[in-house]
Amino acid sequence: MEIKLYEKPPLVKVFNYKLEALRGAASILVIWGHATLNNNMLDPAYSPVDNWFHTGTGHLSVLVFFVLSGYVIGLAHPLALTKYTIGDYVKKRLIRIYPIYFMCLLLALVASNYDFPSLATIAGHVTMTQGISTPIISAISPSWSLVYEIIFYVLFIPISIFRLNPLYVALLSIVIGCVNAYFAHSYGSPILPSYAFGFVFWLSGLVLSRTFSTKGSPIPYSYLLSCLFLFVAIDKLDAPFTLFHRIGILLFGKDLSVLSNYNIGIISFRDLAYLPYCLLILVIFTDKKLAYTKLTLLLFIVLPIFTFWYYYEHLLISNLSSILLPTTAYALAFSCFAFAGRVEVGAEFLIKKLEKTGSISYGLYIVHCPILFLMSQVSVFSGTPFTYAIRMLCFLVLSAWAAFMLEKRFQPWIKMKLY
């Protein structure tokens, strides 16, 4: 199938509120994952023994953000960039990312008073080269993905100018990532494969923005909710991930995901196992016309169930609480799919509530970490399950308020001053 990269843009751009719901859900999963880690950040004197409510979907959420970013950029720039439009493109991208990021960086420096970074590290963050030139400040650790975003935005410029097919560029990016990951131990540079594999996700969103038409009738909200529950489940119920990992070892004779001591934010070869899930979620949330959408969703729901067999055969789960939440989410994903008609009203209500969160999702994603670090330094009112619960509530409220102020007050003011 020949993918047409540049088509005549639609005369009317319709804002997709369902995508806002997806953004909101992904950002909530990131902050929930960070808040529920057993590291005494939320409550310095208490950490739950059986942390059954922790989810490890933060990394998956970032992958979804990358796919979403490529998709949105593709919709916003259906025509090739020219020397007259590149400046405006760069300006819009920087204004969208940098002002909020810079304010959160200042807050992160305040939160780092016990482990203040060096001037070189601060300079690396100001220039957004952290993770490449300097270590990443823990109090703003989610910022690693913003560096990826900036690089992807820059790489989009030649793709657009020269009308390159993003599908072919994605395949080339996979090859570059695999070759460099294979020889990573020889030349000691795991950065390139990480960016290459991350770019595959971004390009996949760009491809999706150029292909498939929108359905005449929208996809049921129950399917959207099923996708979100499935997204929560697949980090622990990772049979597709494990299968892909083993195929990779069989093909290359080694684990391409094991590089060197590169730590925060690395995107590895094995993450490609989640690319089909990310794409299917985006297809469903954008009402794309794809053959056998329902059957494909059912297949993706069924695959993780083989994880239970693997756990049973190898007796890997000594602490059953660790799979309680993923199993519950998995059951809800299947129920929303199987009983779509019965849960449609409730699913529509929940998705529309998440739409409101999507408008502050970037602010939530970047500001919650400095707030969490600040809370870890407050020792009063801590040490019990009750204080933990109250602190969790305060953390969520503070993060939402800060994100609202950044997105709805500060960002519009900055745009007004710079345009």
What positions do the PLM features span?
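Membrane-interface micro-motifs in multi-pass membrane enzymes
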Residues: H59, I140-Y148, S194-F199, I267-Y277, ...
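C-terminal ends of transmembrane alpha-helices
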Residues: N40, G131, G177-G188, A233-F244, ...
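Loop-centered beta-sheet repeat module
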Residues: N180-V207
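Hydrophobic alpha-helical segments of polytopic membrane proteins
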Residues: F162-V175, S204-F231, Y292-T307
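Small-residue-rich segments of transmembrane alpha-helices in multi-pass membrane proteins
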Residues: R96-I100, F201-G205, F229, P304-I305, ...
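Alpha-helical transmembrane segments of multi-pass integral membrane proteins
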Residues: D235, A239-R409
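Extracytoplasmic catalytic-loop and juxtamembrane helix elements of membrane-embedded
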Residues: P48, L119-T129, Y195, L243-N261
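Membrane-cytosol interface segments of multi-pass membrane proteins
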Residues: M1-Y187, S213-L224, L279, G341-G363, ...
